[in-house]
Amino acid sequence: MPKSRVENLCAILISKNSSVEEQVKKISNSDPEQKIIIPFTYDEIHKNLNSELYDSRFRKVFYSRDLFAFKSPLKKDSYFFGRNNLVNELVSKHNSSEHAGVFGLRKSGKTSIIYAIQRKLNIEKKSCVMLDCESPAIHQKRWYELLKEVVQEYKSLKISNVRIDLDSRYDEKNAAKSFEEDILKIYNSKKKETTLFIFDEIERISPFTGSSQHWSNGTDFIYFWQTLRSFYQKHPSVYTYMLVGTNPKCIEQPQFFGQDNPIYLSCSIHYLPNFSANQVIEMVGTLGRLMGLNFGTDICALLHNDCGGHPFLIRQMCSFIHNTYKNERPFTVDKATYRTALADYKSNLQQYFDMMLNVLSSWYPDEYEMLIMLALEDIETFNEFAKDNPSMVDHLLSFGLIQKSYNHKYVLSLDSLEIYLKNKNKFKKITLSDEEKLEEISLRRNRLEKKLRNLILNGLRFAYGKKAQEELLKAIPEDRREKLRSSSINDLLSNNTQLF
């Protein structure tokens, strides 16, 4: 569809094909990002002069689609909101021969940003290579093998016919020199333009977080980036690189394993900000309107506050409302409806927070611990940490997980996140009251008892097989055995057992 269209999210299609409605439905089902198409046949148009057919068809198409339920990265512009300024800035950095880093939590939209950058570069007739470092095909390669991979990807992108010997020249001693020679050959063989190399999931090939030992605990990171950095310093017009990940530690730390970090402070760092109130209104209002849902500015403000401006959480909340009130369209979401939906939706939040914070807790436990300190109101310890580690506070602020209040105190950005962390770390607080200590002891005892029962059950079955129940009964006073004999061994060791 032409870019000059007034309405870019939907279109009317009139066809001679009598099964056009079914064909359009198949296309929409196969591509969730497909624009909304309202199909009619010529016969329908000629035979129906009243508006009933059109009203019915529009309702059927619009109200059946859940435009909020995108869980995969967005590959098209149709439903891409709130990030265009960042995309333009990153492309501008590349056009100025500057490197960049894009960082954010899981489900914050990093991969959608990459796709948007690729689309914009395509429009500008510029080239881009994307390497997914999460793939074993990337992170299992040694540094010199990955250099070879970059050359192959670059040659393929440029559709260059230049002859390059890739078989024998990419070992530890010769890879850096071969890389420079081959990249220059390819660059000079076609139209000369600066290519953007994007390294997605950069943590997978970084020290301490790498998915393979040679990246995590070896010097492959050092040698790989020494090569790319050295080439760039000699030939700044050939390529720039953009690193995409969760945490910019690979750029911020000056040394790794006693050696200088080749890309230390070499990239401008960009965090994916949470949506502003106006961006929430734009996204929710636009998509809701197409689905027959009216979200007023007051409801958008509540969504912004309750979800902390996180676009993924906002979309999932709106999707939940859509599915809850699916049979009522058009439908205005008022405060009472919203509050009811939010209360029901909160049970889904734990899995989303688990997913979003998993990388933080696994790879950057200090930042995660600081979140827990705030949730448990252990402000004194948090402030001590913050004083000694200001970069960690900056990361949490940039992720949109914490805010600095007017009196310079730090608080969690989402009430729901605070509740989640409190429940998950209920007894991690150091200064427990006597009542909290007793509750903690009771909970731990109950958990331990359940584990011991399972251990005993498995041990008896392993040792005695079908005779396990009989062996268990032998340990019980004779006057109680007959009463318990009718119970299975599972029942005897269950939570509701009559054994105790």
Sequence positions of predicted segments:
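Conserved adenine-nucleotide phosphate-binding loops and their immediately adjacent elements
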Residues: 57-82, 86, 262-265, 431
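Amphipathic alpha-helical interface elements
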Residues: 404, 409, 423-500
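P-loop NTPase Walker A phosphate-binding motif
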Residues: 100-132
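Conserved NTP-binding/hydrolysis module of P-loop NTPases
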Residues: 128, 140-165
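Mid-core helix/loop region of P-loop NTP-binding domains shared across ATPases and GTPases
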Residues: 153-210, 218-236
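The catalytic "switch" region of P-loop NTPases
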Residues: 193, 214-306, 320-324, 328-348
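Charged, structured surface patches that assemble and position nucleic-acid processing machinery
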Residues: 4-63
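Winged-helix-like regulatory helical subdomains adjacent to P-loop NTPase cores
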Residues: 75-84, 289-300, 305-391, 395
